[in-house]
Amino acid sequence: MLNIEDMYLEMGIRREVYDFGSQIEGTLKERFDAIDKVAEYNQLKVVHAMQKCKVNAGCFKYASGYGYDDPGRDTLEEVYAEIFHTESALVRPQITCGTHALALALAANLRPGDELLSPVGKPYDTLEEVIGIRPSNGSLAEYGISYRQVDLLEGGAFDYDNIKKAINEKTKLVTIQRSKGYQTRPSFSVSQIGELIAFVKSIKPDVICMVDNCYGEFVEMIEPSDVGADMVVGSLIKNPGGGLAPIGGYIAGRKDLIDNCGYRLTSPGLGKEVGASLGVMQSFFQGLFLAPTVTAGALKGAIFAANIYEKLGYSVIPNGTESRHDIIQAVELGTPESVIAFCKGIQAAAPVDSYVTPEPWPMPGYDSDVIMAAGAFVQGSSIELSADGPIKEPYAVYFQGGLTWQHAKLGILMSLEYLVREGLVTKL
């Protein structure tokens, strides 16, 4: 008689790895039950928003050309505004990725002579060229927009004293990155973000507070826009696309700020009124509908990975028992060989391109070689099972995604299997 264990063995995972994983999984029932409760709340929130905005079959029709009359696009933006409790939203396939969405929001709302402040330290690597920390054509710095950052205190706490000193008459926009990116700091809870925004606005009430919400949507019952963020920004090939959106990004927030984003995305005088959806609306709506459940599966995978690798003695961020504020799990593996082996295991567990061997390469936007494992249906989708990391100290790998918990589990066990095969883990 066939059983689950036989399938894992047939797929190349040795019995010792399977048994070790089963032991860890058995300790996580309460954590998983709590995740399911959050997913249930967020599922109801999404359905309620779709009902309130009268989503109908006509929203899925193909629209081309200028897109002056694109009811699906306009309704989807109403749904996002309803979910995020904002005045407006811009949700478009013409926004190609999370970095594009962030660059758009910044460029649309900053002018020469303004200053951008990051009170949470260095931003994600790809934003360094957007801002001009690393020189790049078309950066904010080229347009006379200055940048200042305040690093976090040891342990990841906000440095309120230096944040207060950094805010000045030129400070126009404060950007807060919720997720850790390629760093080993903690990701921030919505509550922590709310406290930071309240502090910033107590010093300068008219400053724009923008939150990079990538990897954080639907992880908690509330979003940064519920605690004072003027704009929240993210990618549809992460959490809110539910694994079905083939491209896209969103910006939700104050109407005047979103209008500015529309003018920057298309053209002054045109704004949000143009930009046809080109037949992707059904996948955008359906992906959003599935997003709370898909995000829950990814969260379970992250917690499982944390507990597996923590038990083996590795440093993991967050640790196995900490609350979760995004879907990313960082594991400090200590050597380039271990990072590469981990990623090979993730790739081997993929439904697409499982036979491919990932290797480090000089990826545009990064200052070191990066290895990426992602046998995904949508290229670059990080809500699908994926892992990546820069080949530099502390040699940490960043695991995320899994459209289902079961697939995330397979990927994590396969990552461990590859470390065992390479002799990099010798005792379970």
Predicted regions and their residues:
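A short, basic N-terminal segment
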Residues: F32-E40
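Flexible linker/loop signature enriched in Pro/Ser/Thr and Pro/Gly
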Residues: I83-T86
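Conserved C-terminal alpha-helix-loop-beta "cap" of PLP-dependent enzymes
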Residues: E310-K427
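Conserved PLP-enzyme active-site core in the AAT-like
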Residues: L2-E25, D36, V46-C59, G67-D70, ...
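Short glycine-rich or small-residue beta-strand-to-loop segments that form or flank ligand, phosphate
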Residues: C59, A63-S64, L90-P93, I327-E332
